[in-house]
């Protein structure tokens, strides 16, 4: 299963629900927001222990910082694959909750990098016909 942005969150929820009746092999999400609280994260980890799962984040994409964990207690599940640029390169791998990948940047700072949400692995998942998003650096999308 795979998804970008809210589609990534929906892929996680669907995989969790479907895993009762179907075998889920792999889950890859891109720019996914936080999905659940600590109890849900624990339940997901227990149920999906044998599923390959990676949460990919592009540089300072603000969406993975939402909703703010301090506001509602939401957390990420699974390891993070973090690209420190918006193009293909060598990613860093971080365990869930580790702040050395995208977590090193605050939500406020990431809000000035909204273009990073529509630039994954050199592709634009926000608009399939555009190779890269049209942005003004530091101001987000035009």
Predicted feature residues:
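Gly/Ala-rich beta-loop-alpha elbow adjacent to hydrolase catalytic centers
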Residues: 3-7, 11
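Serine hydrolase/lipase
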Residues: 1-2, 16-142
């Amino acid at each position: 299963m795979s998804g970008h942005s809210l589609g990534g969150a929906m892929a996680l929820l669907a995989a969790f629900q479907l895993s009762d009746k179907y075998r889920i092999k792999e889950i890859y999400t891109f720019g996914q927001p936080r999905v659940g609280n600590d109890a849900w994260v624990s339940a997901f980890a227990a149920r999906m222990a044998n599923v390959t799962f990676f949460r990919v984040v592009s540089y300072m994409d603000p969406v993975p910082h939402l909703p703010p964990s301090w506001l509602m207690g939401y957390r990420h599940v699974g390891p993070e694959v973090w690209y420190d640029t918006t193009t293909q390169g060598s990613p860093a791998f971080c365990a869930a909750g580790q702040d050395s990948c995208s977590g090193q940047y605050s939500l406020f700072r990431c809000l000035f990098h909204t273009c990073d949400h529509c630039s994954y692995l050199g592709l634009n998942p926000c608009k399939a016909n555009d190779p890269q998003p049209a942005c003004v650096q530091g101001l987000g999308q035009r």
